[in-house]
């Protein structure tokens, strides 16, 4: 994922937390705030309580990969922060993807069938 698709600055994180709305399930919390750009931006937060640096980085890589795969179905004019909760470190990729897409659907950031999935015609 390119750097212009990431929330990096502390002031941006604080603005999203303060002014944005939150949605959650058992494994993830998502804060979102509309932006004036023509693309979404994502920030990631993984606590040190979830494991050592290797584990935390693996979680972040998986989250970025899930978002990259769902890129075509994500709303464009929003900044959002994904916070991983305790228990995420034990999930496999498929279960993590299911949980993350669930909370993104709750927040209406992810809209199924709105993107790069190709429709197949049956004759």
UniProtKB/Swiss-Prot annotation:
Catalytic reaction(s) noted: Endonucleolytic cleavage of RNA, removing 5'-extranucleotides from tRNA precursor
Entry keywords, A to Z: Endonuclease, Hydrolase, Nuclease, RNA-binding, tRNA processing
Entry GO CC: ribonuclease P complex
GO MF entry, a single one: ribonuclease P activity
Enzyme Commission number(s) of this protein: 3.1.26.5
PROSITE patterns assigned: RIBONUCLEASE_P
Domain of life assignment: Bacteria
Gene Ontology BP annotations: tRNA 5'-leader removal
Pfam families linked to this entry: Ribonuclease_P (PF00825)
Principal EC category: hydrolase
Family recorded in the similarity comment: Belongs to the RnpA family.
Function in brief: RNaseP catalyzes the removal of the 5'-leader sequence from pre-tRNA to produce the mature 5'-terminus. It can also cleave other RNA substrates such as 4.5S RNA. The protein component plays an auxiliary but essential role in vivo by binding to the 5'-leader sequence and broadening the substrate specificity of the ribozyme.
Assembly: Consists of a catalytic RNA component (M1 or rnpB) and a protein subunit.
Protein name: Ribonuclease P protein component
Species: Streptococcus pneumoniae (strain Hungary19A-6)
């Amino acid at each position: 994922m390119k750097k212009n698709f990431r929330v990096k600055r502390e002031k941006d994180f604080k603005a999203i937390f303060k002014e944005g709305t939150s949605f959650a399930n058992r494994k993830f919390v998502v804060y979102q705030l509309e932006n004036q750009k023509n693309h979404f931006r994502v920030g990631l937060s993984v606590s040190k309580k979830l494991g050592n640096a290797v584990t935390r980085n693996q979680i972040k890589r998986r989250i970025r990969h899930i978002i990259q795969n769902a890129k075509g179905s994500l709303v464009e004019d929003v900044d959002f922060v994904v916070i991983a909760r305790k228990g995420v470190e034990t999930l496999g990729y498929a279960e993590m993807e299911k949980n993350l897409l669930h909370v993104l659907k709750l927040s209406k950031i992810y809209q199924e069938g709105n993107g790069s999935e190709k429709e197949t015609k049956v004759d």
